[in-house]
């Protein structure tokens, strides 16, 4: 509910009026003076402050909450012969995916970490 209220204050030579109508507030200052040529002068300054309300609130999920999936593993696909039973295809592809995941994790560790490269080089030298 918007109700209009008005407040008037008179200071020495200046009349100040403030009007509030809920979401807007207007302040008017009128200053009267006499110039050096004995002319009456009036100066009016007015300022309006408007308070705006918005009902379009954006939820947190719409403000750019982005998740990305980064996979450093290798993706391998193998083509099975037509005579292969379905049960062995599932097992084979699962094992292949599992191995490629481990290889991808190891590859990511080796490329991102200089210490891992050094350790793997030492281990390869010991094995050979």
Curated annotation (Swiss-Prot):
The chain crosses the membrane at residues 105-127. GO terms for cellular component: membrane. It is found in: Membrane. The keyword Transmembrane applies. Keywords: Membrane, Transmembrane, Transmembrane helix. Induction: By FLO1. Residues 1-26 are annotated as: Disordered. Its main location: membrane. It is a single-pass membrane protein. Belongs to the flocculin family. This is Uncharacterized protein YAL065C. It comes from Saccharomyces cerevisiae (strain ATCC 204508 / S288c) (Baker's yeast). The lineage of its organism: Eukaryota, Fungi, Dikarya, Ascomycota, Saccharomycotina.
């Amino acid at each position: 509910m918007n109700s209009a209220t008005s407040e008037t204050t008179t200071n020495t030579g200046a009349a100040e009026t403030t009007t509030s109508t809920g979401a807007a507030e207007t302040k008017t200052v009128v200053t009267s003076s006499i110039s050096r040529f004995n002319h009456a002068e009036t100066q009016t300054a007015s300022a309006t402050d408007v308070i705006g309300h918005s009902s379009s609130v954006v939820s947190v999920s719409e403000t750019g909450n982005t998740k990305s999936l980064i996979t450093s593993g290798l993706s391998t696909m193998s083509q099975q012969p037509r005579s292969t039973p379905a049960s062995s295809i599932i097992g084979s592809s699962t094992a292949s995916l599992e191995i490629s995941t481990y290889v991808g994790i190891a590859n990511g560790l080796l490329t991102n970490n200089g210490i891992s490269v050094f350790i793997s080089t030492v281990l390869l030298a010991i094995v050979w």
